[in-house]
Amino acid sequence: LDNKVAIITGAGGGLGRAHALLLAREGAAVVVNDLGGARDGTGSGQSMADGVVDEIVAAGGKAVANYGSVTDDTSAQAMVTTAKDAFGRVDILINNAGILRDRSFKNMTDAEWDAVIDVHLRGAYLATKHFWAALLVQGEGGRIVMTSSTSGLIGNFGQTNYGAAKAGLAGFMRVLALEGMKYGITVNVLAPAA
């Protein structure tokens, strides 16, 4: 992945961190995006993204932090701007940002539903929208990966909001893969079983 530039949302911990460290080890320059909040999406901070950047740089890689929320259009655009300002281009986007607000459907609030859909599905849409536009200007294709879940494919008790969002990502990927073919943009989804 030498000379490739990757943006990874939700890269301050867990699977996103693993993606960031792996891509950096393989030679990519990485934008580590993370709002730095709790698992339920509350709060924010810079230490999570900064910690992953420090790990990458200490291992000899290239990385910069971005602390924006994927749910905000201006912040999603800023992720692409951060990549281009730091590394001159974009090549790879991994939509990994996510939160959990698990509750059985009969007890779920509208706010719990909306928050999860907003981060997982709208967040992936906004990040992809700006990344896609940058790829079209570059004219060299690119790669997009969506982090889904088996909860979106086979279900999991107490995760109607999360399952719906993750199933939505799989559908989003399928259509983007069709539309991206003529531009050399490959789109895939990962559905890990946790």
Residue map of PLM features:
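Substrate-binding pocket helix/loop in short-chain dehydrogenase/reductase
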Residues: 56, 104-105, 109-117
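The beta1-alpha1 cofactor-binding region of Rossmann-like NAD(H)/NADP(H)-dependent oxidoreductases
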Residues: 67-81, 110
